Amino acid sequence: MFSVPFLTSLTSHLGITAIDDASDTLSCLITAFLFITAAILTSAKTYVGSAMECWLPQTYSGDWGEFAENYCFLKDTYFYPRQQSMTDIPMYHKERHRLTYYQWSSMYLAVAGIAFMIPKFLWRLSQSTTDMPVVYFCDTANEIKNETEDKRSAKIKEMARFMRTKITSVHTPSLFSFIRMYMVYSVIKILYLVNAIAQFVIIAIFLGQKRNLFWGWTLFMNLLNGITWETTGLFPRVTFCDFQVREMAGNNRDETVECVIGINEFNEKIFLFFWFWLVFLVFSTLIAHFYNAAQIVKPYFIHSLLFAIRDHDIVDQKELFREFGEKYLTMDGKLILSFVKSQSDLVASEVAVEMYSDFLEARDRANIAEDKYNNILKNGKQ
């Protein structure tokens, strides 16, 4: 089978599992892969190719010319429209149109790619430091979903018993000792969303567009209307660099040279793509997280799993279902069942039915014990 080596390696290190939904994979795998790939491409263009070439005076020798280009590449340059006079360029214009990103674009993209992996890393850390083996339930559901009912029955009972034990047991001491799994899961989901929004803002600040977070849309419309960088100054190909030359007499001579930043041709396309990608990522992550949360919280989730045993003749069954979901399963149990449901609706339903039977038995035992206790109190008063 055809595979991309880097993507395969990234997948294995991130450990994409059954408990990761599509929005998680989109963020921690696909987005990270895109950013890191872009970082590799831009670094090759920046540090291997010719990122900047300057138009230098003829008096500059080869070494002087190379020194001047390296200096201008490391030092921030500024954009100034070529159709305007170059005499006495205001300092405020130089500061406002200063380019500070082209040297660091590959590093930024690499760091951003790593940042998208952080929520996944924390989710894996939480899995390894708690007593809730969520992956086990998903893997088991995936294994038995195509088995016959007889072969599946034993595993269903085992899963239900194991889930009941884990939900009701006290966690071993760890970083997440007093935090329920659903709370950890919710925090991780929020981190995915916060990370996407933060990167949307950071990319604007990095490119010097902090006053216009919608610079990507502006650039896109400019390209459609034939308005180029020569007018807007967005990702300019030609900039200017100021430096001083120390002469033998001890005097310093100010020089201004015109430089071509070839990497900006590439940066324009890369960062425009990522602007649209981050907009898509923010909205898709937001929608996915609200949808997943709503699916677990609303009563229909439990009703759908217990559909096979619904009896409309039982007056208080809805109340029993509600008590089963809120007090017996708790949010942790419903979260696990949602993961199991993502692998097999049938297995999730059968596990829920098995646990509901245990819930009714435990409820009956509790009622009997309560009646005995009340009778003892009543007889004692007599």
Curated annotation (Swiss-Prot):
Record keywords: Cell junction, Cell membrane, Gap junction, Ion channel, Ion transport, Membrane, Transmembrane, Transmembrane helix, Transport
Entry's family note: Belongs to the pannexin family.
Protein name: Innexin-8
Main location: membrane
UniProt function note: Structural component of the gap junctions.
GO molecular function, one term: gap junction channel activity
Origin species: Caenorhabditis elegans
Cellular component, GO annotation: gap junction; plasma membrane
GO BP term (any one): germ cell proliferation
Bilayer topology: Multi-pass membrane protein
Annotated Pfam families: Innexin
Annotated localization: Cell membrane; Cell junction, Gap junction
Domain of life: Eukaryota
Spans through the membrane: 29-49, 103-123, 187-207, 270-290
InterPro entries the UniProt entry points to: Innexin (IPR000990)
Repeat keyword on record: no
Signal peptide, first to last residue: none
Cystines in this chain: none
